[in-house]
Amino acid sequence: MTINQATIDFIRQHQDEDVRQLAFLGSKYPEVNMPFALDQIRGRKMAHVKLPRWASIEGIIYPPHISMEQCSSEQTALYKAELAARLLGLSVSSSENEKECEKASNSHFFKICEFASEGAVDSEFAKNEDTCKKQQILTECDKYVNKSKEKPNEEDFSEEIEFVDLTGGFGVDFSYIASRLGVKSMYVERQAHLCEAAKENFERLGLKNVSVKNGDGIEVLHSFHSKKNAASDTLGITEEQSQSLLKTNFGLKLIFIDPARRDDAGNKVVSLKDCTPDVTVLQEEMLSKADYVIIKLSPMLDWHRAVCELSHVREVHIVSVNNECKELLLVLSARNMGMNMVSGTDLGEKHDENLRIFCINDSQSFVCDETEMASSAVKIASPDKIVSSSVKAVKKVSSDRITSPALDEMPYLYEPNASLMKAGCFGVLSERYDAKMLSKNSHLFVSEESVEAFPGRAFHIIAVSSFNKKELKRQLSGITKANIATRNFPLSVAELRKRLKLKDGGETYIFATTLSDESHVLVICERGI
């Protein structure tokens, strides 16, 4: 990719300025490739928040705005890299890597390593120091980044490829996964300008053993040998030994695919079959050619429906950042997923192959399986355990609010994080943490004892009020502002705030909800337990 000096100088001189104003300067700088320059200035600003490590490296080429919006963040890319490493049996990290991770400017990588070592990302990784030393983690401190001058290979070397990204895009996911795995990897992308940018960027990121291919991902998939053919050609394994060859090291180890979720008119689609390419059609071919397939989908898609439309789905990963659901990942495999929890190696014996659901939100993680979901029932709190109609034996609390002794039985309230809300595993939550929901549709939990490990936000209930005017006045006495949320409630937050005459913010949290007896209440809380 050739960029003239005038354009480079313009980008450096105006990198902190408003691109909307810079767009009017085209006639003043005729030698500058203005569309490209604006993409770089805008892209780098977005990268400071979304991809801080990339933003810190000089010379990274950013794509047009739409591609920057759609690409993964550094945090979610790191999660996928660790997921891929666990599937391929790599070590979570050596002691050296842990030290380097602590030095990194982005601490999310170290948290993800903790998930894996504690089993939240399924199990411990195989301890393999030699493999770990070969890995080049993109979040290491500067002296470990951008030292290699080796350019990405132009050859396909498809017979040696172990990881392929069939829908490369901007290359964020590919770069982190390829770097983490340390195997020969292929990036495939139909758009030539993204391929050109990828070549430049992978060189600056110090990626080795990677191939950039401008082409159609489906055609590239067709070019790979199946595991059966690869083993047959190399070892003479026959068709009757097909079960054994799933454990061979020939052919692809991992396929990553991120199907486009917009139609030709640019409208978002909600069905897996409407995405491009259609993975429901490609799944059998992908599984015949790779040990594992990771499909990245929109969090808007119904994961239950997606699992039904696909075969061999072994894991569902719902990934949130700052309590905002960002990605839905499906792991497919036709091989035995049973793993030795100590060594991370395949024991070759029959294991429980229930679908597992991983709910991730920053440092919070929650894992369950479909059998547990099916057998678990949500416990519903009795209304009289939340607020009593009796007025005798009352006691005073802060700000002269009055509550009944019955409230003391359930003084803690919990709001599940976004990933759990998407997963819908409320019965498992209820049984695992001995917590009860206020009502079937409230998705708010209460408990007698504090549960510090609850995956979500935790609150201490200081009062519960009905909508009786006198009671409202008493319970809200001294409160001028509050953070208000509604759950299974007839009024919107704006309508309720206007009615209560409360400003936004402060340290008080009010949840307006409906109890199991259909009564409407305000649960007044303070953050923390």
Q: How would you label these PLM feature ranges?
A:
Residues M1-I529:
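SAM-dependent transferase fold signal centered on methyltransferase-like domains
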